[in-house]
């Protein structure tokens, strides 16, 4: 997934622009129970194109102030991660030496940079904005982030500058792609190395199509898999708080190309908000999910510890009741071999296709057992169900007033599908259409 970073000096309106981009099209990933959205980054979809938007604190190149130096480091890290950079300047304050220095740094990055002159609230401010051509740029985007002026042109330029989505080769239709997602120091690298060692690597690692990730093809039980490793989150010399934030962004980029997501949890620390966040994004993107509790060897245990811990994880991830939970130790190798055995099962479920006749027998039995509620005082009748896709399993139910189905009944039918067919680790996409909408 592409990344767009907003950088610039403090108080030029970066956060206002960030909020404006989010607010102009409310297609941000929705929160799931227990999931909090970091206000400094968000996944956005514009005209069918998803990207991650980053807001930075501010960029003061020459400052020795500790806070401002930290903000500068944050901006530099955002530039490293970005595919497109929005460099925001202030039309009312005018061109400053700091603007010039930041522009030079951005040019050296080699990344596409859009120069955004903010606080141009009307035509009378356009003339003042022209002085920023002194930065040596061919085009300026004059906007008012506060009022929305000029945003359509800016967003069109952003979408045009984004790199084309990576195209998977024909082999990708037959292989299962795994993303191992975890916070820094959760033991993700050790787990990956242990998995590769256990499963006997049969192909050399190759550079992935997404920057800062490595694709490692391997074979398990005569089936092809590709492990997507977010190598970019393991940088030395970075402050932990920054790594926490940018590891989420790396996770989003990795899971965009994955089929199955392994969310790695630190058994000692327990479930964190970041664990919930990346799992929520995986669910929203329709990925299969496994919850892997690592460092289980470090937990003091008795006969009921695993059961109690499982209950805690289930409660935290209550929006993923279908996700298998595996307790492992990457250090000792304990139960690591069970991960791929479970992945193999989930991959089969993720690609499961159910004949229409079988589906409709399940639908009929479900309705007989529990009739759907009335819609606007009239009886709801279902005609048939059909499967429309896999990865994730997707279904459509046609009826006379199907679009009025209550979410509780949708959940009931989803549970009936799971009872009948399994779909372990897989989200189910279930839609309802009126019979006249079949075409």
Curated annotation (Swiss-Prot):
Associates with the 50S ribosomal subunit. Gene3D superfamilies: 3.30.300.20, P-loop containing nucleotide triphosphate hydrolases. Transmembrane segments: none annotated. Pfam families: KH_dom-like, MMR_HSR1. InterPro entries: G_ENGA, GTP-bd, GTPase_Der, KH_dom-like, KH_dom-like_a/b, P-loop_NTPase, Small_GTP-bd. GTPase that plays an essential role in the late steps of ribosome biogenesis. Disulfide bonds: none annotated. Keywords: GTP-binding, Nucleotide-binding, Repeat, Ribosome biogenesis. Residues 352-436 form the KH-like domain. It comes from Syntrophotalea carbinolica (strain DSM 2380 / NBRC 103641 / GraBd1) (Pelobacter carbinolicus). GTP 2 binds at residues 182-189, 229-233, 294-297. NCBIfam families: GTPase_EngA (TIGR03594), small_GTP (TIGR00231). Residues 2-166, 176-351 form the EngA-type G domain. It comes from the Bacteria. One of its GO terms (biological process) is ribosome biogenesis. GO terms for molecular function: GTP binding; ribosome binding. This is GTPase Der. Belongs to the TRAFAC class TrmE-Era-EngA-EngB-Septin-like GTPase superfamily. EngA (Der) GTPase family. GTP 1 binds at residues 8-15, 55-59, 118-121.
